[in-house]
Amino acid sequence: MKSSEPASVSAAERRAETFQHKLEQFNPGIVWLDQHGRVTAFNDVALQILGPAGEQSLGVAQDSLFGIDVVQLHPEKSRDKLRFLLQSKDVGGCPVKSPPPVAMMINIPDRILMIKVSSMIAAGGACGTCMIFYDVTDLTTEPSGLPAGGSAPSPRRLFKIPVYRKNRVILLDLKDIVRFQGDGHYTTIVTRDDRYLSNLSLADLELRLDSSIYLRVHRSHIVSLQYAVELVKLDESVNLVMDDAEQTQVPVSRSRTAQLKELLGVV
């Protein structure tokens, strides 16, 4: 019997459909903000996740969070990214149309959130913002193991990366990723045959990737050693050729050259 599914539907697209269905079953966190980005209301999910963050990062009790700038509830390294999202405008100038969702990591607790903001309009015009987020931590990470001695818990280990493509959220398998390249507010994720944009920073990724497989060879590059092809020396610099569609030569910083050679078994 022939399948009724179009031949053009890829495995990745089928996985995206399955994940999208799961996402629809989630109870989202919802935060209402006024025109200045100050919190006016939470639903129960948002309070459960952001409440502890406010208590530990700001020393503010949950019942005192109302009226606080929502940016302050996130780690300092994530604040510029969130502020950029809240201030984003539609390229066509539409005051209602909202930017696409972003992935963001918060440290207290250690969670991965997909965040969407929508401008709200009342009879008198713009009146604030509705922020909706989905906690995709359990779909994208796993515990990294027990910390040694009484030390602080290690960040959870990533096994999938959430990205936004064609009006849907897709989870990329780490094993399919050749390299990551940092570029301003975004990180470009490169597979053998495609590229994706992610809002997760290289610093966030580096903490949550297996260091025996993924190495930050340069301030702007993390590579999967499984896709390394060749080390190329050019004058005083060293590049690593990666097995993506362009056979990209990734620069290797001097401080990482010896470590990279050791991991690759190169003398």
Swiss-Prot record:
Residues 15-86 form the PAS domain. GO terms for cellular component: cytoplasm. InterPro entries: LytR-like (IPR046947), LytTR_DNA-bd_dom (IPR007492), PAS (IPR000014), PAS-like_dom_sf (IPR035965). Its main location: cytoplasm. This protein undergoes a ligand switch upon reduction; the heme distal ligand is coordinated by a Cys residue in the inactive Fe(3+) (ferric) form, by Met-104 in the inactive Fe(2+) (ferrous) form, and by CO in the CO-bound active form. This is Heme-containing CO-sensing transcriptional regulator RcoM 1. One-component, b-type heme-containing aerobic sensor and transcriptional regulator that responds to CO by activating the expression of the oxidation operon cox.
